[in-house]
Amino acid sequence: MKFKMVHENYNVKDLDASLKFYEEALGLTERRRKVSEDGNFIIVYVGNETTPFELELTWLKDHPQAYDIGEEDFDLAFHVDDYEGAHALHEKMGCICFENPSMGIYFI
């Protein structure tokens, strides 16, 4: 039996701002969208041409406040062919929240 990773889900407060961020910061664009008939939720799958893996962004009508992730620690890792260029972009965007230069990683 083989399992294949398909997507990771994040709930978002502002779907449009999230879509803009993931496209600008990581080059992820909308692949498909599901809208509930009653308008209570919207799910957008974003990705790029380097992998079939997708990020699922879920907006919930009844959750207008920011999400509190508490002490839960999670991350979605990316490899990039131009580390310095990516770092410069994310630095310009002001979205780097932690760096570990000795490991060659940073978090946005």
Label the model's feature ranges.
Residues 14-15, 80-84:
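Helix N-cap motif at beta-to-alpha junctions
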Residues 5-7, 71-76:
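Eukaryotic phosphotyrosine signaling hubs
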Residues 64-70:
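Unchanged
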Residues 1-3, 33-34, 45, 84-108:
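Vicinal oxygen chelate
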Residues 49-53, 62-64, 83-84:
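Short, charged/polar surface micro-motifs in flexible loops or helix N-caps
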Residues 40, 72, 103:
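Exposed loop/turn and edge beta-strand positions of beta-sandwich/beta-sheet ligand-binding modules
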Residues 2, 9-52:
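Core segments of cupin and vicinal oxygen chelate
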